[in-house]
Regions:
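Active-site-proximal beta-alpha core segment in soluble small-molecule metabolic enzymes
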Residues: 5-13, 20-21, 28, 32-205
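Active-site anion/phosphate-binding pocket segments in diverse small-molecule metabolic enzymes
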Residues: 2-20, 24, 28, 70-71, ...
Length: 377
């Protein structure tokens, strides 16, 4: 990583001021005693997990969640000492490393629960875990019938401390709220059974980004914002949207220019055929950097604050755009693929729309060849 983006033809700029702003927006929906567990899985949705977590910690966040063991270990090795919850599936062979790095697992099956119980016996204090209830996502988790009896067993006493109970909402951003309401009803029934046993759970959490805005009754004691931290939402048009600011901009530089005649072709298989003399700018970014090949012949980039359409097939390392109507363009000219340039902007949700996906995939797909440049909050 370098602090001088002019030395890099292609880079992602991460605006930590926007990140802090988005966190403030999220907190406006919460009661004062409701905590935030920041979701920084998938390299913080492509933004860089270590720097993003460190920036959020400076903003007072004390709880983080990742998808996998290796993501949690990376944060520990970077010096993050606060709570790190591993949301994804765990395997028996991973338990020693999990315990060694003081990572908090979300447990979804009885076998891993047994293994954790044995591993935690050598731990000097009760080892915290969260339990996941499957309420309608059809993915990880104990069924309600499986979970409640566990609290009557010795399995959840002694070396383990059940610190949290969670579920994952499948349709919090859907137009119909009935799916979320059914899931919440199932979850609350399990929670009630546990509390009737006199068991206190410090952290109860169900709310993802969309639920934070739409369903205040899902907040409980902890919420799990992900995409909203990074400046995007998937709320229906009928729901007032928060004032979020996209955090990541993707930029590159014109590396070569050429004029092709009418009938000339661009890129593999000659799929673009010029209908007039056409000025082509070559950009040093491609699908190996996470700029999808599905963007071939669709979408645009910004040069001089104007849209230049992508022409031909996106290559592994290069993209070509038509700059005929943006004279004069020069080698070394700044190009914005995601972000704002002048009065015009292209954000990840628009790029996602061009290729039939979601902003999450666009952001997470930006590869390791693209350096991240951090603008301090």
């Amino acid at each position: 990583m370098t602090s001088n983006p002019t030395l890099l033809p292609t880079y992602a700029s991460i605006n930590l001021t926007a990140l802090a702003h988005n966190l403030s927006c999220i907190k406006q929906y919460l009661a004062p005693d409701c905590q935030v567990m920041a979701i920084v899985k998938a390299n913080a949705y492509g933004h860089g997990v270590v720097e993003t977590a460190q920036a959020l910690a400076r903003q007072g966040i004390e709880r983080f969640a990742v998808a996998s063991l290796d993501e949690g270990i990376a944060l520990r090795q970077a010096g993050l000492s606060t709570s790190i919850v591993v949301l994804g599936a765990l395997f028996e062979e991973q338990i020693p490393d999990l315990v060694a790095h003081r990572l908090t697992p979300v447990v979804s099956d009885a076998h891993i629960l047994h293994i954790l119980t044995k591993a935690a016996q050598s731990h000097p204090a009760s080892y915290p875990i969260h339990l996941k209830v499957e309420t309608g996502m059809g993915r990880l988790g104990f069924s309600p019938a499986e979970l409640s009896p566990l609290f009557d067993e010795m399995l959840l006493r002694g070396p383990l401390q059940v610190e949290g109970l969670m579920t994952h909402l499948a349709d919090a951003d859907g137009k119909n709220s009935s799916v979320t309401e059914r899931q919440l009803e199932t979850f609350c029934a399990v929670l009630s059974q546990i509390r009737q046993r006199g068991i206190t759970l410090p952290f109860v959490h169900t709310a993802n980004s969309a639920a934070i805005v739409r369903f205040p009754n899902t907040h409980f004691s902890l919420v799990r914002p992900g995409i909203m931290l990074y400046g995007y939402h998937t709320l229906p048009d009928t729901v007032p949207a928060p004032d979020l600011r996209p955090v990541l901009s993707l930029r590159t530089t014109v590396v070569q220019l050429r004029t092709i005649p009418q009938g000339g072709t661009v890129s593999y298989n000659g799929t673009f055929v010029a209908t007039r003399p056409t000025r082509i700018a070559v950009l040093p970014i491609g699908y190996a950097d996470g700029y999808s090949r599905r963007l071939s012949h669709r979408g645009s980039v910004l040069i001089q604050g104007r849209r230049a359409p992508i022409v031909g097939l996106v290559c592994m390392d290069m993209v070509m755009v038509d700059v005929t109507d943006i004279p004069p363009v020069h080698i070394g000219e700044a190009v914005t693929l995601i972000g704002q340039q002048g009065e015009e902007s292209i954000w990840a949700n628009e790029v996602a729309g061009w290729i039939g996906t979601i902003s999450y995939e666009v952001l997470c797909g930006i590869g390791s060849r693209v350096p991240r440049i951090y603008e301090s909050a």
